[in-house]
């Protein structure tokens, strides 16, 4: 537990002024964060570490750009990202898309967000012949810099590595 708390504090300080979140299920614990590296344009470095009690751990690091879709008046931000993902015997360089939207019809700020990342065989290494990650989250931001959410995550290399529903908390700095 001490190692987990220390890791959380270290990663939280690395991602200062942006966000860090913790996703918890019965068998997994994932810590994610992102850091804005450009103040004029929304360009980020991001990373995450998944502790899986049944399999080897999973880590990723990458870059992301985010903004409004050109020519569309939608209440959502879209993102493009490129990550490097790694487990004990698999690695890949997936390209991904994401969406993040707040639902303004309610008295408290509800949100929904999702990501999909894919790497074909040419971008998959070691024992992996492809990579696919799907993630959907929904929650409430009940204080200015804090949120609570539930989500679903599916990570696959040759076969399903992790498919789980989880709950989590997030903090922005």
Task: Describe each region flagged by the PLM.
Residues 1-19:
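Cleavable N-terminal export/targeting peptides
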Residues 1-2, 45, 112, 152:
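Short, intrinsically disordered low-complexity segments
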Residues 5-10, 34, 66-68:
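Intrinsically disordered, low-complexity boundary segments flanking structured domains
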Residues 16-62:
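Short glycine/proline- and aromatic-enriched beta-strand/turn motifs that initiate or cap beta-hairpins
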Residues 17, 29-30, 37-39, 64-173:
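Outer-membrane beta-barrel transmembrane domain signature
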């Amino acid at each position: 537990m001490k190692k987990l708390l220390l890791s959380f504090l270290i990663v939280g300080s690395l991602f200062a002024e942006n966000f860090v979140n913790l996703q918890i299920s019965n068998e997994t614990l994932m810590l994610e964060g992102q850091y804005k590296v450009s103040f004029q344009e929304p360009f980020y470095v991001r990373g995450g570490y998944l502790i899986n009690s049944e399999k080897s751990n999973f880590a990723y690091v990458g870059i992301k750009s985010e903004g409004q879709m050109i020519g569309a008046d939608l209440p959502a931000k879209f993102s493009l990202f490129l990550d490097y993902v790694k487990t004990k015997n698999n690695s890949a360089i997936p390209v991904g898309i994401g969406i993040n939207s707040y639902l303004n019809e309610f008295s408290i700020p509800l949100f929904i967000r999702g990501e999909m990342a894919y790497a074909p065989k040419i971008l998959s290494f070691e024992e992996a012949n492809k990579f696919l990650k799907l993630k959907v989250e929904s929650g409430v931001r009940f204080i200015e810099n804090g949120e609570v959410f539930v989500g679903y995550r599916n990570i696959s290399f040759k076969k399903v590595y992790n498919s789980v529903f989880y709950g989590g908390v997030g903090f922005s700095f």
